[in-house]
């Protein structure tokens, strides 16, 4: 445990192309092995692809996709007297955004399209329409929390 308390959060810089912090977070989630310019190329390409398919602002499409993927509840393990319970808890807004981006990127990497740009673009489009694996992940998380609602009084 650090003695000085938690490290201060560094402010996110707005994205230079779209002027959005969400796009910056998405670039950072795509990033592998420090290749930031490649990650930016993938994200910008995916957003252009989404613009071509929908004809609307890609940042609005991304926000709509994230709203469909963000979880409101999740389960956390809590050990009580030798038994481990899955206790449903509400998700903080910053964590829900982080989880949504993580799921979008993770499930877009598992898709079958040829390039990562197409995969990410199609996962964003599917999520904005309420489809796709990342939306299913959110539904599964909510179902798990609902199923363990009886243990909600163990919340901390």
Curated annotation (Swiss-Prot):
One of its GO terms (cellular component) is small ribosomal subunit. GO terms for biological process: translation. Pfam families: Ribosomal_S7. The keyword Endoplasmic reticulum does not apply. The keyword tRNA-binding applies. Keywords: Ribonucleoprotein, Ribosomal protein, RNA-binding, rRNA-binding, tRNA-binding. Disulfide bonds: none annotated. It comes from the Bacteria. One of its GO terms (molecular function) is rRNA binding. SUPFAM superfamilies: Ribosomal protein S7. Gene3D superfamilies: Ribosomal protein S7 domain. PANTHER family: RIBOSOMAL PROTEIN S7. Belongs to the universal ribosomal protein uS7 family. Part of the 30S ribosomal subunit. Contacts proteins S9 and S11. One of the primary rRNA binding proteins, it binds directly to 16S rRNA where it nucleates assembly of the head domain of the 30S subunit. Is located at the subunit interface close to the decoding center, probably blocks exit of the E-site tRNA. NCBIfam families: rpsG_bact. This is Small ribosomal subunit protein uS7.
């Amino acid at each position: 445990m650090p003695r000085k308390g938690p490290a201060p959060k560094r402010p996110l810089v707005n994205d230079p192309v779209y002027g959005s912090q969400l796009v910056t977070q998405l670039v950072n989630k795509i990033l592998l092995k420090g290749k930031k310019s490649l990650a930016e190329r993938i994200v910008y390409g995916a957003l252009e692809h989404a613009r071509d398919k929908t004809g609307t602002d890609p940042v609005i499409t991304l926000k709509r996709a994230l709203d469909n993927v963000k979880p409101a509840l999740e389960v956390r393990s809590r050990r009580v007297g030798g038994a481990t319970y899955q206790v449903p808890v509400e998700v903080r807004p910053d964590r829900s955004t982080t989880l949504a981006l993580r799921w979008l990127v993770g499930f877009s990497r598992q898709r079958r399209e040829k390039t990562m740009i197409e995969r990410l673009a199609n996962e964003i489009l599917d999520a904005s329409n309420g489809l796709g694996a990342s939306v299913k992940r959110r539904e599964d998380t909510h179902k798990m929390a609902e199923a363990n609602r009886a243990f909600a009084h163990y919340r901390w």
